Amino acid sequence: MRGARPAAGGGRWVEISPERLRGWLDGFYGRHDGAAEDSLTLTGASNGDTATLHPPPGFDGVTDVDGLLTALIRPPRIGLLLARKGAVAAGVVDGTAVVVSKVERHYVQGRTAAGGQSQQRYARRRDNQATAAANRAADVVARVLLPYGTADAEEPIGALVCGGDRLMVDAVLADRRLAPLLPLRHPHLLDCPEPRLAVLQDAAVAARRVRIHLVP
């Protein structure tokens, strides 16, 4: 389980690995003298505390706790896209194993303290480098994920999970070739450092966790 983080609007988030979820639920029931279930929300009998379970990406049809526990036994295949200024990583994940992947680094100049024409020249160069980096990243995503991103694919992905810098991810997915992936994009953005293979493997594990919103 990852440590609790404050949630916007109140409460806190915890993330539970699939194999630990049943034990976590047993603990919640025990601490609250039982709980009422309404879809994916548990309400503690002793004090009204609530826990709302958010299934991992690709579990769109899950509507109750029992259904979630059953679905977690055989999770769907998912795609990963991690992007930051200096690198991109794309992969296909079965369970928590990355079965297809590609990582590519690129150079984008940092900001400069120079002023006047020099600053404008650096800014133009930096913008050009950022555009070129997004284009190369889109090439990587097209090669790795598009073969799995359509309904008629032999082994389609059930969701696209993104991580890193949201602006960079958006720039990559703006490529028209990647339009078939957009309906699969999951809204939650993984927090990750500059992509490497090890980071991609860590993201494959993180993407499978069940996110739980606890109030209070």
Residue ranges, per PLM feature:
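Terminal alpha-helical anchor/extension segments at protein ends
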Residues: 1-216
